[in-house]
Amino acid sequence: GGDADVVLTYGRPGDVILVGDWDGDGTDTFAVRRGNTYHVKNSMRGGDADAVFHYGRENDAVMVGDWDGNGTDTFAVRRAATYHVKNSLRGGDADTVFTYGRAADITLAGDWDGDGRDTFTVRRGATYHVSNSLRGGAPDTVVTFGRAGDEVHVGDWDGNGTDTLGVRRPVGPAPVAKEVRSAAK
């Protein structure tokens, strides 16, 4: 409980909010995506963006990660099963393009092997196909974890520098209280 440490206004209603360490200072801040335009902020204050650029297409799925291990987060966009990875906060061509998984897969980004570089895992139901490099082909590891309907989160839960999976499982509908009264006359 209690009051927030920081309250700020940034972006517009309908913007997609993204979080990352854009300038490598060790602090995550916000970026907003409006279509294929990114507005990146390096501080927890409102006002103008520190960087504005176009990347990818409006309907691309976007992921945030430190793809090259330099300490700064940038964007990758996914189009079907093809990934377009950018290592700078600028428009233009991707630095790396590859196909991995299937178009219907769910993609998760994380540093799965603790080398300081984020890569992708694709999820099919409760099966995860983990790649430790930005390339197509066979996964480095295949793991079954949780259930197909679980909500999945990625994090370094124990502080060892390696991301792993965590799941949140809905426990079903909220209990319903029903009071039954007899109609006494």
Kindly label every feature range from the protein language model:
Residues 1-185:
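Trp/Gly-enriched beta-strand/coil motifs that build multi-repeat beta-propeller-like domains
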